[in-house]
């Protein structure tokens, strides 16, 4: 057997040649994790050491997940969608992306899920790009003060708690008090601006349904279609049957779609119906992921959940296009308790609230706005001149009426001034009633509120207030130019008031009450007022 000799020079030469000719493999590498446990919309995943917070992950069946908890040994993942097919041992892969949704005008008139996928059976949506869900809100220097009105078409709100473009106005109240009805009426009222074709007036609307019944969402869509409002509205639907993950991200999806329009100089109205359901979904996710519970078992960052969402609603500066996104968050209370955790959180974040009282709703006062607790902190600067002039005393008159009404229940005798105040308050309360899906124009609101606050209805039976108002508006529309003048100037001058006073008095003379009696008794003509003397006949005279 030949002796083996090792030559170091030969070995060194062979290694050098190998290193020079070596080419790394082009095969891509990918981190792979495995499902340790799964259930209730949550999965615990091992592996994936490079995973980032809020990164999108994909499961074997294509379902997406959101990396929520980054623990030492595993990742807590919120499953976005159906979680029944996810089982222990399945592979999980990173995407290297954060959650985003498609955006663009193609979303107008469509119903989508929280991932931006159409669910209305009308085909694919033509998009203009994507926008991440966790987008930063505009900073202070890029905001413009709220100074443009956003009319709801509801007399009680536009007169007493006005809303401006870029404002966050909370709608709060017990279940079945008309919260959604106010939001839908506000969307329908934007139709007049949309049909004008003026981009500065047009408002694109987004309705985010969180935790609602599927039949309720379908009913809202049908109402918007019948009113012709669906062409400028997008519905983001996350019904009660959806997973907690979908309910959690749905408001952020709607906000991302709206921000795309806002930063392009357009005006947006977004309704979150409702944030109580989103907070409950976030609570269930946090408890399943073993995050420490706080007050009412909500996690400690539930305030941040809503603040980072609602702070995106703003009117941006002219440098960024001058667009706006107005937010109408809805929160449900229990037994009219506005001091609960979520209501107080959202009240402190928003620019005002409209509180709907269940007692008023049950007494057929609809919209059931509680004047005493409802407020708009910044909307007054955006209110039109005309409406501001006529509604100055309305809120205080109604507040005094409420307090005097409770006192009058125990008082046997009232002075004339108190009786007059009670009478005026009762007529104003009746005047502010408004059926659903019948928004008023700004000029109609001005005339109605003026007539109520100036005693033009004080001598009417309560049941005739609304018929009188309807007849008065028809009379003014067909016989005068007063409504047109108010609409074009957005002001209520002394000359306009004098002409309106004369026209309303003329209508009062023609109005007949439900009892069949004229409101104003006609005075008999003067030529018939002098008595006719009988001719005297004296006997014996010729």
Swiss-Prot record:
Residues 518-542 are annotated as: Disordered. InterPro entries: ATP_synth_asu-like_sf, ATP_synth_asu_C, ATP_synth_asu_C_sf, ATP_synth_F1_a_nt-bd_dom, ATP_synth_F1_asu, ATPase_a/bsu_AS, ATPase_F1/V1/A1_a/bsu_N, ATPase_F1/V1/A1_a/bsu_N_sf. Keywords: ATP synthesis, ATP-binding, Cell membrane, CF(1), Hydrogen ion transport, Ion transport, Membrane, Nucleotide-binding, Translocase, Transport. GO terms for molecular function: ADP binding; ATP binding; proton-transporting ATP synthase activity, rotational mechanism. The record marks 374 as: Required for activity. Its main location: membrane. Residues 519-542 have a biased composition (Basic and acidic residues). ATP binds at residues 173-180. It is a peripheral membrane protein. One of its GO terms (cellular component) is plasma membrane. F-type ATPases have 2 components, CF(1) - the catalytic core - and CF(0) - the membrane proton channel. CF(1) has five subunits: alpha(3), beta(3), gamma(1), delta(1), epsilon(1). CF(0) has three main subunits: a(1), b(2) and c(9-12). The alpha and beta chains form an alternating ring which encloses part of the gamma chain. CF(1) is attached to CF(0) by a central stalk formed by the gamma and epsilon chains, while a peripheral stalk is formed by the delta and b chains. Belongs to the ATPase alpha/beta chains family. PANTHER family: ATP SYNTHASE SUBUNIT ALPHA, MITOCHONDRIAL. This is ATP synthase subunit alpha. It comes from Bifidobacterium adolescentis (strain ATCC 15703 / DSM 20083 / NCTC 11814 / E194a). The lineage of its organism: Bacteria, Bacillati, Actinomycetota, Actinomycetes, Bifidobacteriales. The gene is atpA.
């Amino acid at each position: 057997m030949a002796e083996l000799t090792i030559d170091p020079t030969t070995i060194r030469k062979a290694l050098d040649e190998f290193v020079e000719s070596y080419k790394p493999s082009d095969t891509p590498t990918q981190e792979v994790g495995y499902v340790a446990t799964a259930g209730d919309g949550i999965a615990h995943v091992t592996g994936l050491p490079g995973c980032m917070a809020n990164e999108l992950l994909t499961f074997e069946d294509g379902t997406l997940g959101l990396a929520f908890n980054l623990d030492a040994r595993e990742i807590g993942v919120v499953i976005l969608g159906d979680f029944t097919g996810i089982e222990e041992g399945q592979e999980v892969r990173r995407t290297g992306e954060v959650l985003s949704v498609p955006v663009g005008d193609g979303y107008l008139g469509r119903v989508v899920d929280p991932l931006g996928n159409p669910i209305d059976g009308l085909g694919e949506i033509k998009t203009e790009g994507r926008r991440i869900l966790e987008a930063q809100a505009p900073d202070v220097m890029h905001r413009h003060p709220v100074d443009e009105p956003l009319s709801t078409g509801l007399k009680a709100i536009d007169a007493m708690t006005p809303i401006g473009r870029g404002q966050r106005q909370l709608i709060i109240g017990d279940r079945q008090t008309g919260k959604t009805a106010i939001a839908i009426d506000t969307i329908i009222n934007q139709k007049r601006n949309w049909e004008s074709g003026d981009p500065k007036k047009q408002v694109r609307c987004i309705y985010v349904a969180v935790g609602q019944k599927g039949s309720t969402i379908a009913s809202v869509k049908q109402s918007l279609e019948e009113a012709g409002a669906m062409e400028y509205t997008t519905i983001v639907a996350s019904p009660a049957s959806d997973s907690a993950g979908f309910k959690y991200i749905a408001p952020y999806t709607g906000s991302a779609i709206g921000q795309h329009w806002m930063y392009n100089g357009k005006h947006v109205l977004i309704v979150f119906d409702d944030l109580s359901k989103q907070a409950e979904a976030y609570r269930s996710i946090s408890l399943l992921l073993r995050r420490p519970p706080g007050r009412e078992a909500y996690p400690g960052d539930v305030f941040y959940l809503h603040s980072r969402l609602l702070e995106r609603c703003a009117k941006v500066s002219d440098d960024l296009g001058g667009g706006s996104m107005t937010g109408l968050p809805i929160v449900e209370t229990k037994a009219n308790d506005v001091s609960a955790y979520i209501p107080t959180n959202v009240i402190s974040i928003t620019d005002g609230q409209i509180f709907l009282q269940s007692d008023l709703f049950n007494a057929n006062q609809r919209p059931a706005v509680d004047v005493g607790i409802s407020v708009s902190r910044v909307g007054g600067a955006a209110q039109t001149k005309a409406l501001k002039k006529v509604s100055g005393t309305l809120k205080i008159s109604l507040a005094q009426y409420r307090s005097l009404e409770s006192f009058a229940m125990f008082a046997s005798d009232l002075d004339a001034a108190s009786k007059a105040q009670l009478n005026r308050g009762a007529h104003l309360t009746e005047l502010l009633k408004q059926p659903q899906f019948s928004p008023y124009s700004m000029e109609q609101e001005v005339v109605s509120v003026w007539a109520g606050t100036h005693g033009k209805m004080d001598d009417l039976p309560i049941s005739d207030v609304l018929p009188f108002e309807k007849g008065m508006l028809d009379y003014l529309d067909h016989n005068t130019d007063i409504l047109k003048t108010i609409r074009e100037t957005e002001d209520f001058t002394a000359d306009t008031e004098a002409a309106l006073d004369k026209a309303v008095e003329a209508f009062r003379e023609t109005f007949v009450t439900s009892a069949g009696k004229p409101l104003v008794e006609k005075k008999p003509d003067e030529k018939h007022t002098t008595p006719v003397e009988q001719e005297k006949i004296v006997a014996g005279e010729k």
